[in-house]
């Protein structure tokens, strides 16, 4: 039997047709196809890849994260039925970061490692300086356990920065999509540079891949990853991720689903890490997954 290649996926979404029916008709675009944990695992394993750690991240179009909890049960059933095939898979989850939803009970689930704020294309000026620091949010931060993190996603670096500055400094944070840097603005975009500086000052902020939303060309994304490594440190990058099922389009209007599947996404981050390694002399493996123990210890 061929030896499987071990992989970590620090950002993926699993959801069913039943999950999607809950939001059918309420979105301004076509719903994605269902993306189940079972199909994802089978496709990777059959391709010679062994996913050893997977983070099922809250899907922004859903009103809650019940799909994340359902995936925990799904894996448990798979492992009971076929421990040889699925027994080495570890699944964790990041749930919706809404104070009313992220209760003590939900955050206490042993597989929940964090909670996600989703702001999409919210402009910086729409984020008041107290939006994420009122009484309800402060109580939520207190409920986060020391190993858990707050996951922040916005399409503008300045929006990410405004949120980050409202979070207590002892709360660990992960910034999605490399801080949402923009290829056309370059690595000197003031807001992105300020975000890196804030992250360095705090010392407990990580930047997560896979990076193809910055550019689907690895060498271009690598410029930004190199800057993160130099500004914040190689121990603050979580590059190995797929963001499956690859919703949206790239800078040239091509659907990500036409460019990537999980295997191709892993190949993409490998290529990015190779470019960064040449520029920094940091080993590829460290760039890909060196910080994963801090994500899910």
Where in this protein do the model-derived segments appear?
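H/E-rich (His + Asp/Glu) clusters that bind or coordinate divalent metals
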Residues: 182, 186-297
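An N-terminally biased module of ancient metal coordination in phosphate/nucleic-acid-related enzymes
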Residues: 1-73
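Hydrophobic faces of well-ordered beta-strands that scaffold small-molecule active sites
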Residues: 8-12, 55-59, 87-93, 113-117, ...
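Distinct, well-ordered alpha-helical segments
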Residues: 69-76, 101-109, 126-133, 156-171, ...
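Active-site gating/metal-coordination segments in enzymes
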Residues: 66-155, 206, 211-215
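Active-site environment of divalent metal-dependent phosphoester hydrolases
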Residues: 13-18, 64-67, 98-100, 122-124, ...
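Short, electropositive alpha-helical surface patch
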Residues: 68-87, 170-177, 225-232, 258-259, ...
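Short, acidic/polar
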Residues: 36-46, 98-108, 192
């Amino acid at each position: 039997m061929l030896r499987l290649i071990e992989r970590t996926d620090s950002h993926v979404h699993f959801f069913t047709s039943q999950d999607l029916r809950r939001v059918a008709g309420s979105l301004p675009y076509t719903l994605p196809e269902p993306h189940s944990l079972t199909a994802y695992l089978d496709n990777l394993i059959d391709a010679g890849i062994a996913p050893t750690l997977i983070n099922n991240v809250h899907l922004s179009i859903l009103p809650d994260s019940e799909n994340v909890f359902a995936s925990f049960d799904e894996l448990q059933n798979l492992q009971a039925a076929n421990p040889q095939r699925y027994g080495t898979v570890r699944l964790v989850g990041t749930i919706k970061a809404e104070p009313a939803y992220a209760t003590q009970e939900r955050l206490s689930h042993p597989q929940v490692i964090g909670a996600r704020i989703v702001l999409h294309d919210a402009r910086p000026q729409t984020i008041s300086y107290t939006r994420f620091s009122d009484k309800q949010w402060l109580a939520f931060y207190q409920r986060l356990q020391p190993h858990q993190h707050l996951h922040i996603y916005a399409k503008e670096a300045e929006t990410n920065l405004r949120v980050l500055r409202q979070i207590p400094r002892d709360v660990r944070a992960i910034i999605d999509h490399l801080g949402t840097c923009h290829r056309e603005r370059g690595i000197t975009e003031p807001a992105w540079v300020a975000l890196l500086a804030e992250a360095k000052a705090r010392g407990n902020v990580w930047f997560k891949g896979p990076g193809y939303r910055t550019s689907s060309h690895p060498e271009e994304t690598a410029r930004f990853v190199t800057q993160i490594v130099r500004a914040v440190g190689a121990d603050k990058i979580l590059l190995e991720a797929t963001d499956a099922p690859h919703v949206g389009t790239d800078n040239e209007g091509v659907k990500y689903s036409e460019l990537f599947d999980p295997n191709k996404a892993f190949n993409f981050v490998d290529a990015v890490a190779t470019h960064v390694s040449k520029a920094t002399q940091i080993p590829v493996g460290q760039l890909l997954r060196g910080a994963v123990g801090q994500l899910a210890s």
